[in-house]
């Protein structure tokens, strides 16, 4: 594919997740929106009118579009893998919403298919594109905080009960989020998975074993709304995780994570927003003074635009996307281990194919 030509996207699924992606495609010179698809024609028509693109209720019509290069797939979790497979089988690159699949078998099949077809398979873990996450990765990889010894993940959200019926946007009603067989999981899979991916990206570490408890304590749904877990990483570092979907009074900044090193620590105080990375170092490093907390300067990044453009460049250059199917598989393995550990009341050791720490 000629480098520099805009990648022509189709949208599969026109619910709440699709709107900011359509905005990002419209804002990028590297991307172009050519068609939208949803079985709910009202949803498809709404986005089509706003973003000046044709729409269809027939997936085959979208996949047969003569100029289509790639699709963005944003549908209920249980439909992600089947629809991504159809796109790949049709010869289209696929950028899929997390978690990509509900089982490792499904994820592995998609990865193998994409590689066999020489197609890009990306997953929309967009936090990698924030300024603070990039700064954190640079500091950790350069050794500024020394060896990573611990991670603390906190996901406190005050979701309305209506979330389980209509999501954040309220654009349509479908109770799939609260059904175990359709969602695959609750607050850990839907929310904390973003942090798990971010920690892998920043530290380069892998989770090797998990102990956990989960519960459904505040909502009338089949999936967890509360979870706590202990993680061990492949360098021996420890991690703690707490997630709650219905925490009264939870505010911006109550979703955050900290990375502790032998020579300093990092706090990402608002991973979804624009708050700067907070840094404490025991030693001077690269112009950063030791012994006090400081906020790193940096302009907020247009995260969705950068995620779309990173995928588009991968397609143009015939390279793997920066957040690919294997990344999503690793996160899914951690989440499934959390659920298994809670169900079986024991520590789950992830396989040696996914980690190196004995």
List each language-model region with its residue ranges.
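Active-site loop of classical SDR/Rossmann-like NAD(P)-dependent oxidoreductases
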Residues: 39, 296-308
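N-terminal Rossmann-like dinucleotide-binding module
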Residues: 1-51
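Rossmann-fold dehydrogenase core element
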Residues: 109-127, 146-151
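Beta-loop-alpha module in the N-terminal Rossmann-like domain of NAD(P)-dependent dehydrogenases
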Residues: 21, 40, 53-113
């Amino acid at each position: 594919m000629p480098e520099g030509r805009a990648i022509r996207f189709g949208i599969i699924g026109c619910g709440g997740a699709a709107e900011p992606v359509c905005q990002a495609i419209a804002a990028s010179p590297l991307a172009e929106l050519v068609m939208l698809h949803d079985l709910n024609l009202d949803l498809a028509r709404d986005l089509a009118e706003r973003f000046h693109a044709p729409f269809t209720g027939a997936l085959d019509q979208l996949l047969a579009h003569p100029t289509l290069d790639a699709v963005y797939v944003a549908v209920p979790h249980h439909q992600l893998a089947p629809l991504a497979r159809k796109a790949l089988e049709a010869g289209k690159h696929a950028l899929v919403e997390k978690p990509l699949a509900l089982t490792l078998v499904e994820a592995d099949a998609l990865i193998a298919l994409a590689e066999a077809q020489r197609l890009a398979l990306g997953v929309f873990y967009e936090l990698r594109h924030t300024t603070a996450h990039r700064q954190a990765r640079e500091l950790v990889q350069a050794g500024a905080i020394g060896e990573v010894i611990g991670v603390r993940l906190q996901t406190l959200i005050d979701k309305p009960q209506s979330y389980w019926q209509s999501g954040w946007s309220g654009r349509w009603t479908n109770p799939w989020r609260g059904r175990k067989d359709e969602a695959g999981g609750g607050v850990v899979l839907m929310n904390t998975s973003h942090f798990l991916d971010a920690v892998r990206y920043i530290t380069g570490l892998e989770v090797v074993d998990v102990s956990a408890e989960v519960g459904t304590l505040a909502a009338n749904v089949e999936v967890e709304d509360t979870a706590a877990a202990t993680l061990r990483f492949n360098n021996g570092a420890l991690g703690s995780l707490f997630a709650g979907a219905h925490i009264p009074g939870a505010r911006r900044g109550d979703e955050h994570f900290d990375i502790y090193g032998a020579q300093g620590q990092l706090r990402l105080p608002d991973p979804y927003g624009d708050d700067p990375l907070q840094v404490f170092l025991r030693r001077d490093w690269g112009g950063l003074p030791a012994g006090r907390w400081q906020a790193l300067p940096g302009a907020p990044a247009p995260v969705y635009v950068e995620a779309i453009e990173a995928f588009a460049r991968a397609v143009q250059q015939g390279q793997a996307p920066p957040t690919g199917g294997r990344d999503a598989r690793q996160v899914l393995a951690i989440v499934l281990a959390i659920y298994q550990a809670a169900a079986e009341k024991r520590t789950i050791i992830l396989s040696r194919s996914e980690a190196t720490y004995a």
